Each structure stands twice: as structure tokens, then as C-alpha cells.
């Protein structure tokens, strides 16, 4: 679970995602957005996993209940950030939509998560109104974090810990990555 904050503009940020993340992060971002809806607009209840363990779930009062993904990793910093206010949610939604477009551009296919586009387009009804957008909280090892700079932290994370994934189909290598 993460939000790869590689550029403040969601379109450019999506283009900077490496090939592996273009595929994988579409699912994770849909999970983050779905979790925001469930936790903010849903009613909490206790359910049981397939193994019989108790688990918290949130039931939505409308069609979203049968459309959106289940809530997951609810205390992860990326999840907390995504549901903190409508501006953070909106930025993540725009990144996700641009990543869906990027997936189609790179692979000439439509990602299965595109079916959630309409359901996630509107922020949760009860989400806090944000006065300003904040940068996603870095979720990575401390040795690559740059104090008070999420963008530099995520670029560091990519250049130091994600080199094995450094492929960009139909895209040039990002200039900040190529400079290392």
C-alpha cells in the first residue's frame, strides 16, 4: 500500500510510474479510494474472515456497497492521508484516472478497475472539506525519506529502492531518474 507521489501534477505523476506500478498501483489506489468511502460514509460492523477471525467492515447505504472494494489497511499512512479531506481524495482520484489512461496507452487495454470510475468520481459525502491539498505521507524506509519533502522522498525511494523495476514502456525515463 502506497501512493507514489512522483510529481504534483496527477497526469505527469502517472506518466512517471514505472511499468510495474502502472499495473499494480491502479488496484491499490482503487482500494484507497474505496476504503475512504466505506470508512467515512459506511456503518461499521463486525464480520468474519474465511478463517473465522473477527474483522471490522463498513457497509454503505447505497449501490456503492456492491460496487466498491472492501476496506483494507485502514491505519496505513496512505489511507489516512487519502480520507483526510476532499482535496486529498480528489488528487488521488485524478492520479488514479490518469493511471488508468496510462495503462491503456502503454498496454492497449482497459484495466478491469476502470469499472469503478463512476462510483469513485465523487468524494465520500461526509469527508472533511480541505482548505488546501497536502502531499501524500511518505510510506517507505527512513533512509530514503527527506524531511518535510514527500516529492523528494518518493523520487529517492524510486531511485534507490525500485531500480529493479526501472522500465517505462512507450515513455522516456523521467529526467530526475535518468540523472542518477
Task: Place the predicted regions along the sequence by residue.
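Sequence termini and other peripheral, non-core segments
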Residues: 1-75, 79-180
Amino acid at each position: 500500500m502506497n501512493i507514489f507521489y512522483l510529481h504534483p501534477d496527477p497526469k505527469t505523476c502517472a506518466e512517471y510510474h514505472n511499468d510495474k506500478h502502472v499495473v499494480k498501483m491502479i488496484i491499490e489506489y482503487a482500494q484507497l479510494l474505496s476504503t475512504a468511502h466505506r470508512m467515512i460514509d459506511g456503518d461499521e460492523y463486525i464480520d468474519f474472515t474465511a478463517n473465522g477471525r473477527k474483522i471490522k467492515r463498513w457497509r454503505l447505504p447505497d449501490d456503492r456497497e456492491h460496487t466498491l472494494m472492501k476496506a483494507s489497511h485502514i491505519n496505513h499512512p496512505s489511507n489516512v492521508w487519502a480520507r483526510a479531506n476532499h482535496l486529498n481524495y480528489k488528487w488521488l482520484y485524478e492520479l488514479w484516472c490518469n493511471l488508468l489512461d496510462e495503462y491503456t496507452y502503454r498496454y492497449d487495454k482497459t484495466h478491469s478497475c476502470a469499472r469503478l470510475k463512476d462510483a469513485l468520481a465523487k468524494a465520500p459525502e461526509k469527508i472533511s472539506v480541505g482548505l488546501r491539498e497536502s502531499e501524500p505521507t511518505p510510506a517507505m524506509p527512513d533512509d530514503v525519506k527527506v524531511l518535510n519533502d514527500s516529492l523528494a522522498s518518493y523520487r529517492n525511494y524510486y531511485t534507490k529502492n525500485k531500480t529493479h523495476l526501472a522500465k517505462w514502456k512507450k515513455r522516456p525515463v523521467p529526467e530526475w531518474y535518468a540523472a542518477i
